[in-house]
Swiss-Prot record:
<dbReference type="InterPro" id="IPR001328">
    <property type="entry name" value="Pept_tRNA_hydro"/>
</dbReference>
<feature type="site" description="Stabilizes the basic form of H active site to accept a proton">
    <location>
        <position position="91"/>
    </location>
</feature>
<dbReference type="GO" id="GO:0004045">
    <property type="term" value="F:peptidyl-tRNA hydrolase activity"/>
</dbReference>
<comment type="subunit">
    <text>Monomer.</text>
</comment>
<dbReference type="InterPro" id="IPR036416">
    <property type="entry name" value="Pept_tRNA_hydro_sf"/>
</dbReference>
<comment type="function">
    <text>Catalyzes the release of premature peptidyl moieties from peptidyl-tRNA molecules trapped in stalled 50S ribosomal subunits, and thus maintains levels of free tRNAs and 50S ribosomes.</text>
</comment>
<comment type="function">
    <text>Hydrolyzes ribosome-free peptidyl-tRNAs (with 1 or more amino acids incorporated), which drop off the ribosome during protein synthesis, or as a result of ribosome stalling.</text>
</comment>
<feature type="site" description="Discriminates between blocked and unblocked aminoacyl-tRNA">
    <location>
        <position position="9"/>
    </location>
</feature>
<feature type="active site" description="Proton acceptor">
    <location>
        <position position="19"/>
    </location>
</feature>
<dbReference type="InterPro" id="IPR018171">
    <property type="entry name" value="Pept_tRNA_hydro_CS"/>
</dbReference>
<keyword id="KW-0378">Hydrolase</keyword>
<feature type="binding site">
    <location>
        <position position="112"/>
    </location>
    <ligand>
        <name>tRNA</name>
    </ligand>
</feature>
<dbReference type="GO" id="GO:0005737">
    <property type="term" value="C:cytoplasm"/>
</dbReference>
<protein>
    <recommendedName>
        <fullName>Peptidyl-tRNA hydrolase</fullName>
        <ecNumber>3.1.1.29</ecNumber>
    </recommendedName>
</protein>
<comment type="similarity">
    <text>Belongs to the PTH family.</text>
</comment>
<dbReference type="GO" id="GO:0072344">
    <property type="term" value="P:rescue of stalled ribosome"/>
</dbReference>
<feature type="binding site">
    <location>
        <position position="64"/>
    </location>
    <ligand>
        <name>tRNA</name>
    </ligand>
</feature>
Length: 185
């Protein structure tokens, strides 16, 4: 069983903000597959689906970003999912807008959602799909991540979602992190 987690903040206020890039990417994937998050448990919206013969949990925690680990930890424990079978999709401001990078474990890189997941899982050994949102020039980091993309940036971001969909499909199909990094990084 795989667990695909998208990070973001709940509520309409944050819906199109840079910090919700993970939610936007997973929502695109689910729309393309005709799936929806139809369950509410673990302080998260989730769906349990069969994709390409594999049982998959798709999840969007409904806590604020820095509490995301609670939902991920609870779901991983409940469904008995090994951290190596978890893929977390999240924003990364150390990369240009829409740039994608896969990592197999490692530190949080200062991302509070990832810090929370590491703390709740008790390990750094889970997979991440980072989506670039660019570092703010002179704007504060908090204000940058909590504002929407401008129309050109939004277009660029949405153009990357087809590749995100391929990465998710490959992960579900059992391609390991090394394969994904070699193919997509």
């Amino acid at each position: 069983m795989k667990l695909i987690v998208a990070l973001g903040n709940p509520g309409l206020k944050y819906e199109k903000t840079k910090h919700n890039t993970g939610f936007m990417a997973l929502d695109h994937y689910l729309d393309e597959k005709g799936l929806r998050l139809d369950r509410d448990k673990f302080t998260a919206l989730y769906a349990k689906e069969k994709v390409a013969g594999e049982d998959v949990i798709f999840m969007e925690p409904q806590t604020y970003m820095n509490e995301s680990g609670r939902a991920v930890g609870a779901a991983a424990k409940f469904f008995k999912i090994d951290p190596s079978d978890i893929l977390v999709i999240h924003d990364d401001m150390d990369m240009p807008i829409a740039k994608l990078r896969i990592r197999a474990g490692g530190k949080s890189g200062g991302h509070n959602g990832i810090k929370s997941i590491i703390a709740c899982l008790g390990t750094e050994k889970f997979n991440r799909l980072k989506i670039g949102i660019r570092h703010p020039d002179k704007q504060s980091v908090v204000s940058w991540v909590l504002t929407p993309f401008n129309p050109d940036q939004q277009k660029e971001l949405e153009a990357s979602f087809a590749k995100v969909d391929q990465i998710i499909d490959d992960f579900i199909a059992g391609k390991d992190a090394q394969y994904l990094m070699n193919r997509y990084n």
